[in-house]
Amino acid sequence: MFYEVRFHGRGGQGAVMAAQALAVAASHDGSSAIAFPFFGAERRGAPVLAFARFGQERLRVRTQVYEPHFVVVLDESLIETVDVLAGLRPGGTVVVNTMGSPDRLVLSKKAKSATVD
């Protein structure tokens, strides 16, 4: 089994670096891991996606993450403009970078949620 994580951020916020750091940390723990970005020619501040996939089995899948176990949102305002929970697996978790509590998040569907500042 492997885990899939999708990062939502804005250009320059570190979504790509966060995905890469997660993959490196997982590989140091003995897991197979891969991370990659998805963005076009947008400028700094435009929405970007990054993905990480890791697990004990050999990774053969090198596609975008469509059904993540975890979603990390680096800019809370993206929740209003992007369907950040699209494809989130049942029982999945969303982590949002905000000073607010998980109770005040307005999410498009039921999901486990956590906040971190």
For the regions a protein language model found, what residue spans apply to each?
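Active-site cofactor/cluster-binding pocket
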Residues: 1-117
